[in-house]
Amino acid sequence: LAEQLSHSHIYRGEISHRRFHPKAHSFAYQLFMLALDVDEMEAKQCPKSIFGFSWFNLLRFEEKDYLKGEPESLKQRIKNKVIALSDCEDGMAEVSRITMLVQVRCLGLYFSPANFYFCYDANENCTQVLVEVSNTPWNERHYYLVPIEQNNNDDNSATHVTNKNFHVSPFMNLNMHYQWLFKPPMSNSDKLFIRIENHCNGDNKDDDNKADNKQKVFDATMTLSKKPFTSKAFWQLWCNLPAMTLKILLGIYWQALKLLIKRIPFFGYQKSQPTEPK
């Protein structure tokens, strides 16, 4: 059965966070994410391993964890959200496959700061990415739609800009915008790269955040390598990186404590702004 999962893979590597203003702060850690083909997950295909769909699996896929609260099947929920964030429905007509780069339940616990839904056309070109962002402890979700520009170079410059409309960190306000760069999962590449940059908006006049206009305040970079979606690979992963969800949650609060100690300006909860269609 493992051979049937032609589009699902394990990705393992490193994520780094760097803060540049008002004080420098950085960290990096090892992590894994699963690139799951939506059709294969809806068909409940997987090798016999610690990953599966039952309560006893150490790593468990629950369809309800993604685009939570939306009606219909997972694939249709993704399509509906993409259409809602687009200025037309034509884009989804060209989507033949969706790969979701996500965390799954680990020992029954689920939290994922960001899930990425890569949409591919019939020629296996990734055309757009739906990004599902979650915050803690509020457990809210917000969605960004990022078009992917096709190019054949290795330029790591950010390729798309969206306004920041969702409160994630109490150490950054909402008067910012994101710059995104994706090198998506591809059948002809073993590498995956995602970078998100936070830049101040040009009209940022907040006295507690005196960054220069459009200055880069923060970036997060994830560099991952593809591994086979097999029972052996899952056991190796578990031995090296157990309890991934707990590691993520503890890491968020540990780094927040460090920022408090550094006296980084603190912003109370900020109400999310609606995302406008492209």
Regions found by a protein language model. Give the residues of each.
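Mature, function-bearing regions of proteins
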Residues: L1-K278
